[in-house]
């Protein structure tokens, strides 16, 4: 039988290993507008905040720093920094850790819930800013109010038709 000719070798370097220069990691600075948004949104503030590639995460325990292991996501994603403002994320409003502590929320009836899940805006006055949308006590997502209507921020991939 004529094989493919694969070859494996393990090399060992003898001698003194030169110490590599380590880059000093600067701690990521959370933008002021992001901390203000969190302070305005939650009754109880998260203990730890972390920024990675413009995304802000929150946890009650310290974040793990494992340099050799790629960690996809730690904690709850609060939002993403876009053009000097924080664009909130769905995770923030539906998480068990932070969803129950939202300062501004609206309890929907069945008809409003169906409209919300379909991606429609709701004609509800009196709410300004981001509002958590609840149905029978369950957090489904969020909307942004301008005082006259709640504009739906439910993710397009989750909407029903």
Pin down the residues of each PLM region.
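Class I S-adenosyl-L-methionine
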Residues: 1-5
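Conserved beta strand-loop-helix elements of the APE1-like EEP
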Residues: 6-14
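Polybasic, low-complexity RNA-engagement segments
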Residues: 14-161
């Amino acid at each position: 039988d004529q094989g493919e000719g694969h070859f494996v070798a393990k090399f060992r370097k003898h001698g003194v290993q030169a110490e590599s220069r380590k880059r000093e990691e600067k701690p990521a600075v959370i933008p002021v507008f992001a901390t203000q948004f969190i302070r305005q949104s939650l009754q109880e503030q998260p203990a730890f905040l972390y920024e990675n590639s413009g995304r802000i995460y929150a946890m009650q325990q310290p974040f793990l720093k494992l340099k050799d292991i790629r960690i996809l996501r730690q904690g709850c994603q609060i939002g993403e920094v876009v053009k000097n403002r924080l664009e909130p994320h769905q995770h923030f409003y539906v998480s068990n850790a932070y969803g129950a502590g939202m300062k501004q929320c609206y309890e929907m009836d069945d008809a409003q819930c169906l409209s919300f899940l379909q991606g429609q805006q709701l004609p509800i006055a009196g709410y300004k800013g981001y509002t958590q949308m609840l149905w029978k006590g369950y957090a489904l997502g969020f909307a942004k109010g301008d005082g006259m209507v709640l504009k739906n921020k439910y993710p397009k991939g989750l909407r029903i038709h």
